[in-house]
Amino acid sequence: VLAAQGVQIKVHYPECCGMPMLEQGNIEKVSESAERIAESFVSFIEQGYDVIALTSSCALMMKYEWPLILPENKSIKLLSENAFDIDEYIVDISKNEGLVDGMKPVDGGISLHLACHSRAQNMGAKSNELLKLIPDADISIVERCSGHGGTFGVLSPTHELARKVGKPAARQVAKSNPSYVVSS
């Protein structure tokens, strides 16, 4: 989608954003990672590139969590001001420049789970706006906790609780009987 829009792309993934470490309370490791990652993006930002996170968790870390953890770090501040969630970025392009022709309808309904890490960015339901760009899209929205919570849903001590928390969201998805299930 970005290439079709004429966006010049450079892929740069130095390492994990550290969300799993943050969820485990390891602020020291998150800080170390944040400093390394932010510094690695400075030259791209200085060349005029925006930084686009492909997951809402990573966008949340770069835009909000890292600046709270290391508020005096200039590289982190610069990155936070130039980082975007992928949905947010494409929706902004569509509003400001329009999208190239060629978007085709999908066969069947779409169930969209608005992830907590997406909602925490206070940017609105950009993933819903993005999906609405698909002609004739039939979208049902799930605004309930999935219970996953990063590592919370997969760790043995909390797995059953996570399943219990996520059941209402799963039921809502099943009820809409979609062809596609996506999460922001």
What are these regions, as identified by a protein language model?
Residues 1-184:
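Iron-sulfur cluster-binding electron-transfer modules in prokaryotic oxidoreductases
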